[in-house]
């Protein structure tokens, strides 16, 4: 099973409670503990200017899209061993779908 369109409103709540402490969404909001997510879709791992990534993130070499985010958000440390993202992941596929649907709308 892979990505399916989710509920952006539920994704917004997930972002607020699970992601917003470390990430921003809009252009120019800048990096926090984690990199700014503006322009996320179609971007390569480890490529946000001014953010200090681990070598693991820089060398992963994948492009963020629905499918890569769906897999990554289940267990970030398994998908990119050595990442400094201190997030255990979203185990429920529905939660990942909701969050990815929200991110696609809000990071353009």
UniProtKB/Swiss-Prot annotation:
TM spans, by residue? none
UniProt cross-references to InterPro entries, sorted A to Z: Cyt_c-like_dom (IPR009056), Cyt_c-like_dom_sf (IPR036909), Cyt_c_1A/1B (IPR002327)
Query: Where is heme c bound in this sequence?
Result: 19, 22-23, 85
Q: Name one Pfam family in it.
A: Cytochrom_C
Where is this protein primarily located? mitochondrion
An example molecular function term from Gene Ontology annotations = heme binding
Q: Where in the cell is it found?
A: Mitochondrion intermembrane space
Please describe the post-translational modifications of this protein: Binds 1 heme c group covalently per subunit.
State whether keyword Iron applies: yes
Q: Which domain of life is it from?
A: Eukaryota
Q: Which residues form the signal peptide?
A: none
Naming one, the record's GO cellular component terms include: mitochondrial intermembrane space
Q: Which UniProt keywords apply?
A: Electron transport, Heme, Iron, Metal-binding, Mitochondrion, Respiratory chain, Transport
What this protein is reported to do is described as:
Electron carrier protein. The oxidized form of the cytochrome c heme group can accept an electron from the heme group of the cytochrome c1 subunit of cytochrome reductase. Cytochrome c then transfers this electron to the cytochrome oxidase complex, the final protein carrier in the mitochondrial electron-transport chain.
Annotated family: Belongs to the cytochrome c family.
This chain's protein is named: Cytochrome c
Organism name: Cochliobolus lunatus
């Amino acid at each position: 099973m892979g990505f399916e369109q989710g509920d952006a409103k539920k994704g917004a709540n997930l972002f607020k409670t699970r992601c917003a402490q470390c990430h921003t969404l809009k252009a120019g909001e800048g990096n926090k503990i984690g990199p700014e997510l503006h322009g996320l879709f179609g971007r390569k791992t480890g490529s946000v200017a001014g953010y200090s990534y681990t070598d693991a993130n820089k060398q992963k070499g994948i492009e963020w899209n629905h499918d890569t985010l769906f897999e990554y958000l289940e267990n970030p440390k398994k998908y990119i061993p050595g990442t400094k993202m201190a997030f255990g992941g979203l185990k429920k596929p529905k939660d990942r779908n909701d969050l990815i649907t929200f991110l696609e709308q809000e990071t353009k």
